[in-house]
Amino acid sequence: MSSLLVDNIGELVTNAGAGDGPLGIRRNAAVLVEDGLVAWVGPNRYPPPADRRIDAEGAAVLPGFVDSHAHLVFAGDRAAEFAARMAGEPYTGGGIRTTVGATRAATDDELRATVRRLRGEALRQGTTTVEIKSGYGLTVPDETRSLRLAAEVSEETTFLGAHLVPAEYADRPDDYVGLVCGPMLAAAAPHARWIDVFCERGAFDADHTRAILTCGQAAGLGARLHANQLGPGPGVQLGVELGAASVDHCTHLTDADVDALAGAGGATVATLLPGAEFSTRSPYPDARRLLDAGVTVALATDCNPGSSYTSSMPFCIALAVREMRMSPTEAVWAATAGGAAALRRTDVGQLTPGARADLMILDAPSHLHLAYRPGVPLIRQVLHNGVPQCRP
């Protein structure tokens, strides 16, 4: 059994009840890691012996970020589309087809290189758990290989065959839904933990969304969905009704939507993706409204080549505080424990005995600096499963 002690921690965010406030903060603390798990958390003056030691030098230590919404399997980029939006063209989601064409044409090695590059990029910024969706293949073999490549770097894989109706089915959306619920789901399910649907105008309506999610649940996949990004719609309430783990975007909400999420009691998380609003110059979700209603909120990057090409959870924290009226403490919780809740995980997003030893050491004395110093590389060191991964 190997052991590692991280000591001289000035501020330890545990996300557990034993510490102070909603982040369970402990001062002058230490963490013992054994065989990839947190074995002990306690005061720095009484640390247990360990084989190795990392001196945090009085800095803040946090659980690794849990990015519960990302699209990392794709080819090409859409920089020209971004420039056009910044010049005033509206975002409608149609650029997804551009990425579908490039992804279908790419080799496995080309897609693998992109996935690994973005996964490494995220890890260097403190993300130790990332959900990865398919959705840029939209054929049985392309969706299956997307999930297979995603599974090489993450245990959280999501089948998003219902990202958009591809061009070859434009006049036959019912036939495409049949393909998604039939051969595509059968091929994808062994490689996925979740099923997702883009429930928006121009993509999939409520009836199609219900049919696809219900088929996925019958195949043993957990449900989650994109909802209410481009305008008000049925997605949020449908997600709550079907017991989805998370409804994502939540930009345009009615009072009934908020009430439904609050009534879910945390079983359905509202995952907010401020990188998308930043990159599309769109109105941000009202996180304050959700939090004040008692809704469980997560933050994620929505990393994708079209509407949110960022892998940075610290950037999303800063946006959430500046643009969505979250406090720094709320944003950090949403980016760690909130993301874990959106994935229905209890082994990540916290630093408590038995949890996975995923943590980051900041080049800062407090978690507040993640929002206070936007754009600054504050992640000094990352541990994943108790193993030091990178030291920028």
UniProtKB/Swiss-Prot annotation:
Task: Tell me which GO cellular component terms the UniProt record holds.
Answer: cytoplasm
Compartment list:
Cytoplasm
Could you say which residues bind N-formimidoyl-L-glutamate here? 136, 304, 306
Classification via Pfam families: Amidohydro_1
Which keywords label this protein?
A: Cytoplasm, Histidine metabolism, Hydrolase, Iron, Metal-binding, Zinc
Annotated Gene3D superfamilies? Metal-dependent hydrolases (3.20.20.140), Urease, subunit C, domain 1 (2.30.40.10)
Q: Which positions bind Fe(3+)?
A: 69, 71, 226, 302
Binding positions for Zn(2+) per the UniProt entry: 69, 71, 226, 302
Q: List its EC numbers.
A: 3.5.2.7
User: Where along this sequence does the record place binding of 4-imidazolone-5-propanoate?
Assistant: 78, 136, 163, 229, 307
Listed under catalytic activity are: 4-imidazolone-5-propanoate + H2O = N-formimidoyl-L-glutamate
> Which terms does the record give in the GO molecular function aspect?
imidazolonepropionase activity; iron ion binding; zinc ion binding
Q: What does this protein do?
A: Catalyzes the hydrolytic cleavage of the carbon-nitrogen bond in imidazolone-5-propanoate to yield N-formimidoyl-L-glutamate. It is the third step in the universal histidine degradation pathway.
Which HAMAP family would you find in this protein's record? HutI
In the record, the note on similarity to other proteins reads:
Belongs to the metallo-dependent hydrolases superfamily. HutI family.
This protein's name: Imidazolonepropionase
- The organism is Salinispora arenicola (strain CNS-205)
User: Which gene carries the instructions for this protein?
Assistant: hutI
